[in-house]
Structure formats: structure tokens, C-alpha cells
């Protein structure tokens, strides 16, 4: 059996200018990064005769290895193309932290990949490096401001802007800077986040154009004065420099699938510690050019899909016409109590228990009023009895189920899912927001925790409650909420699998992100700088004297 990278290496790619031509984009509309990658110059002209349908792919709570949501996404896009629908896949860029850590890349798998997979999973077009440079330039400017006058009285103890790196590096979570004497700056305690957690990543993914990006950058709160008043980038006059560093990164990236379907891969916030959606500009561009735009939101529907619908959708101005919930037999069994070592065996009892996890995700999407289908991402170890149990469960809830064999067969293995999605997208949907945006941040957190997660109550730390009082005084109550929590559980405890009910959900702290336009609520012990596992993916990779890489997935 070939590995993902071996399959990708054997693929015959179409020159990117020909992929662009499929969308009506001529060579002046793109900036090529080699033969198979390009940036799309903005704005693009909409194609009025297209259907402009939006399909959101989400999933149940995953196992640590992930459940192939990106694989199903790509397979679905290729299947829609095989059915002669102009289709564009809109997805996030991978972070090199997980690529070299535990989860691996994010370009799909098997015969459902976006390519060139090696480039996309590594440095791609440099967007993450530009974001890292912009973020850290702002951090350096802040430290310089503290040292050279500090006219606004920014309190070094209350600077909340952190540096970032696109690596999993737990040693950088808490650091002290400015040591070494008076010429080395003002000593202060700070830390590093991973680049996808940066507010600049969220801003890049929510900005509607370069002017909006600059306006959002200017609204970033970097810290507070000695009088506890917020200080923004705009007050410091640093927004121009930061925006200059992002002027190319804001342009969406165009690549292709193994089936030669156009794919716009742009932006990469994580869904557990950020809002987990690709850029608004990428999705809008795809919608303007295609009959069907197939996009994804990170991790389970409790994280990525909720944030897509409550944070991204209002900016995008478009509600999904259909939702696909990806489930796997192994993840359902894992959520039902099976050990990771037993997931290759038939575990009908654990599978039945784990179906409660899927059922809650179904109910959550139905609460929004969206047409949906469940896609079973097929693994070779799945048995007919396991598949039937899932099908019977979903049919009892009025939801159709389709088995997708995207990894092994690409678009051809996902045709049934594509036909179901086309039928769903023609239905009339009546979207219902989860919460009132005029509600307080506390009320919004409680709504998400009780209605989406199944919590009985929310416990706020003393620090969080004090922050809520401050936010009310500052007029920040109308911002949406972005909860940072574990992806493995509906709770804030990653060991509580399945579909727990009536539990206490814990919020320890809030982080205002006015540039992005939301407030982050940190739940449990969620960290914004991941660490590496005992055996990182990095140690399984090799490169030979000719530059050929193995072990990348």
C-alpha cells in the first residue's frame, strides 16, 4: 500500500495557470509561485451563472489521529467535479507544528489530497512566515515603546501581546524578556503562542480586503495602562508596518487536488484554540467562481462548525446550503469506551455507546436549521455490522448516511455523497442563530456550553468574572465568543469522551481580540502553545541526497 506522500509524488499535476483557467482566471489574475502554486489577485469578478452553493464539512469528536475530514472534503470536491459541477475546495493551510508533531499534515490522504502536498504541508507560499514576522515585529515595537518613553503609560505587567512561532515548543510557553541590563529593554514576563493562535491569523482569515485588515490590526488590544485602560495598535501607530508585512499573505493560494479540482488553501487558525476556519476571502473567492464551494471547519462540530456559524458566517454573509458530518467507526468506538489499541476490532457495544456523540453533533446542526448528511469515512477494518448500526441510528433521526471511500478511491469513492449533497443544497434552509449577539459574554458562553456541549452549568474563575465586569465597562459585550477547549470532548476534560451531560464547564480566563472581532474564553487547561508528543512525526521523516522526502503525511 502506497503512503500519502508516495501517492502525491506519482501524481501528474496540471500547470496552475490551466487550473486557474478552469475558473475563468487569466494569467494576469494570478501570481505564480512555481509551476503548481499561485496567489489569486483580488478582487475577482463573480461568474453570475454559477449556483454559488456552500457546503460545510465538519465531524464528530476525533481520535488523536484525526478522522479524515480533509480526506472526505477533497474526495467530495472531486466527486462533484466528476458530476460536472464547477467546484472549488476552500480549506485551511497546515501548520508545521502538527506536521512535525502528532497529527501530521492537513492536505487530505490517499487518493483524496490537495497537491503539491509536500509544499503545502511545509513552507507553501510563505503565509505563515509572513504572519509570524508581522506578529513578532509588533512585539518588538511594543518592547521598544516600553523602553523609549512609553508616553501612554503601558504597564509592562499587563502587556498581553505575545510572540509566536509555527512550532510545537512547550519550553516557550512562559519566558522572561528584557534581561541583561538597561540596554536590553524592560524586563517582563511573557510567552509564545503557536502562529495559528495569533490574533493576526484570525484577522487575516476574517478580513474582507486589505483596508479592512489594516482597520482590524489597528483595533488589536496589546495591553493595558497603569490605570487599566486598554492600549491598541492604532494608538501606538504600528498598524501600517504590520499591514505591510501581510500585503501578500492576504491573497488566497490556488492549488489543485489529485483529481485536478481547483483548491483555494488559505489561512490556518486551529479550531481548539482559535476560530478554526479558512479565510473569508478564500471562501468568497470560491463562491464567486463556482457552482459548489466545499469548505471545512476544524475538529468536531462543537468547535469548528459552531465557530464557522457564529463567527465566520456573519462576516462571510453566506450560510451553508448543506452540512456534512464526517464520522468513523473507530472514533465512535473510541467515544464509546474502546481503547486505541482495540479500534481495529469489531466493538459493537462500544460503537453503540459512542453513537451518542454523533447524535449530539446531529442535534446541534439541526438546531441551526441546516440540511445535513452523515458521511462514514470508510476504513478497511470496518465491518458490515458496524456500518449498519450507524445507518440505523441516523435513519431513526431522519438523517441520511453515506459511506465515503475517499482515501482509497478519491472522487469515484465519494460519488454517492456528492449526489446527496447536491440534493440537500437544493432544499430551503431556515438558519437559526445559536445566541443573541447583544447578550453578555457570560450569557453567550453559557449558551454554547449548555446547548452545544451539554453542560449543566458554567463555573467562571474569579479572574474571568473580573474581566467580564471590565468588558462591560469598555463596551465589548456585543462581540461573539470563541471558546478554546479540548477537541476530544464536549467538556473541558479530554478524558470525558462520548456525550456527557450535566457537567460543570470551567472558564479560567478571557482574552479580548478586538481586531479579530471576538472574545476568546479559555476553558480548562487549554494551552495556546502545544508541545510535542513522546515520538514526534519529525523523527519518522527522512530526506535523501536528491531531496526526496519520506514519512510526511
From Swiss-Prot:
One of its GO terms (biological process) is tetrahydrofolate interconversion. The keyword Nucleus does not apply. It catalyses: (6S)-5,6,7,8-tetrahydrofolate + formate + ATP = (6R)-10-formyltetrahydrofolate + ADP + phosphate. It comes from the Bacteria. ATP binds at residues 63-70. Pathway: One-carbon metabolism; tetrahydrofolate interconversion. Keywords: ATP-binding, Ligase, Nucleotide-binding, One-carbon metabolism. Its EC number is 6.3.4.3. PROSITE patterns: FTHFS_1, FTHFS_2. GO terms for molecular function: ATP binding; formate-tetrahydrofolate ligase activity. Belongs to the formate--tetrahydrofolate ligase family. This is Formate--tetrahydrofolate ligase.
Amino acid at each position: 500500500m502506497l503512503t500519502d506522500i508516495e501517492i502525491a509524488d506519482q501524481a501528474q499535476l496540471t500547470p496552475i495557470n490551466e487550473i486557474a483557467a478552469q475558473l475563468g482566471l487569466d494569467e494576469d489574475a494570478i501570481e505564480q509561485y512555481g509551476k503548481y502554486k499561485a496567489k489569486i489577485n483580488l478582487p475577482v469578478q463573480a461568474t453570475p451563472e454559477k449556483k454559488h452553493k456552500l457546503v460545510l464539512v465538519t465531524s464528530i469528536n476525533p481520535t488523536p489521529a484525526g478522522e479524515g475530514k480533509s480526506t472526505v472534503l477533497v474526495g467530495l470536491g472531486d466527486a462533484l467535479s466528476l458530476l460536472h459541477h464547477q467546484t472549488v475546495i476552500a480549506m485551511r493551510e497546515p501548520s508545521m507544528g502538527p506536521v512535525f508533531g502528532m497529527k501530521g499534515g492537513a492536505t487530505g490522504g490517499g487518493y483524496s489530497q490537495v497537491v503539491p502536498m509536500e509544499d503545502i504541508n511545509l513552507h507553501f507560499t510563505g503565509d505563515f512566515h509572513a504572519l509570524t514576522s508581522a506578529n513578532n515585529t509588533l512585539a518588538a515595537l511594543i518592547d521598544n515603546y516600553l523602553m523609549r518613553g512609553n508616553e501612554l503609560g503601558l504597564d509592562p505587567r499587563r502587556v498581553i501581546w505575545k510572540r509566536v512561532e509555527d512550532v510545537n515548543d512547550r519550553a516557550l510557553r512562559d519566558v522572561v524578556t528584557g534581561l541583561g541590563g538597561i540596554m536590553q529593554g524592560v524586563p517582563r514576563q511573557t510567552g509564545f503562542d503557536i502562529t495559528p493562535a495569533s490574533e493576526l491569523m484570525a484577522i487575516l482569515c476574517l478580513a474582507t480586503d486589505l483596508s479592512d485588515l489594516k482597520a482590524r490590526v489597528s483595533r488589536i488590544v496589546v495591553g493595558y495602562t497603569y490605570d487599566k485602560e486598554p492600549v491598541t495598535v492604532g494608538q501606538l501607530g504600528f498598524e501600517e508596518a504590520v499591514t505591510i508585512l501581510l500585503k501578500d499573505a492576504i491573497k488566497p493560494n490556488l492549488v489543485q487536488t489529485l483529481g485536478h479540482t481547483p483548491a483555494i488553501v488559505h489561512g490556518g487558525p486551529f479550531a481548539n484554540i482559535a476560530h478554526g476556519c479558512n479565510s473569508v476571502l478564500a471562501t468568497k473567492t470560491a463562491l464567486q467562481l463556482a457552482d459548489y464551494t466545499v469548505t471545512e471547519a476544524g475538529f468536531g462540530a462543537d468547535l469548528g462548525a459552531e465557530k464557522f456559524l457564529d463567527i465566520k458566517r456573519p462576516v462571510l454573509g453566506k450560510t451553508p446550503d448543506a452540512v456534512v458530518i464526517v464520522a468513523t467507526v473507530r472514533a465512535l468506538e473510541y467515544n464509546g469506551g474502546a481503547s486505541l489499541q482495540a479500534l481495529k476490532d469489531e466493538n459493537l457495544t462500544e460503537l453503540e455507546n459512542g453513537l451518542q456523540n454523533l447524535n449530539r453533533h446531529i442535534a446541534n446542526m439541526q438546531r441551526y436549521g441546516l440540511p445535513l448528511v452523515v458521511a462514514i469515512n470508510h476504513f478497511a477494518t470496518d465491518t458490515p455490522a458496524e456500518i449498519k448500526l450507524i445507518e440505523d441510528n441516523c435513519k431513526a433521526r431522519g438523517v441520511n448516511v453515506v459511506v465515503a471511500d475517499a482515501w482509497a478511491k478519491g472522487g469515484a469513492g465519494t460519488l454517492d455523497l456528492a449526489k446527496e449533497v447536491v440534493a440537500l443544497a437544493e432544499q430551503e434552509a431556515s438558519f437559526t442563530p445559536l445566541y443573541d449577539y447583544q447578550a453578555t459574554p457570560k450569557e453567550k458562553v453559557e449558551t454554547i456550553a449548555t446547548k452545544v456541549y451539554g453542560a449543566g452549568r458554567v463555573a467562571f474563575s474569579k479572574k474571568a468574572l473580573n474581566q467580564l465586569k471590565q468588558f462591560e465597562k469598555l463596551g465589548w459585550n456585543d462581540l461573539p465568543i470563541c471558546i478554546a477547549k479540548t477537541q476530544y470532548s464536549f467538556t473541558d476534560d479530554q478524558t470525558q469522551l462520548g456525550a456527557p451531560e450535566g457537567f460543570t464547564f470551567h472558564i479560567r480566563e478571557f482574552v479580548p481580540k478586538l481586531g479579530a472581532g471576538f472574545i476568546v474564553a479559555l476553558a480548562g487547561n487549554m494551552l495556546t502553545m502545544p508541545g510535542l508528543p513522546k515520538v514526534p512525526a519529525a523523527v519518522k521523516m527522512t530526506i535523501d541526497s536528491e531531496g526526496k522526502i519520506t514519512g510526511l503525511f
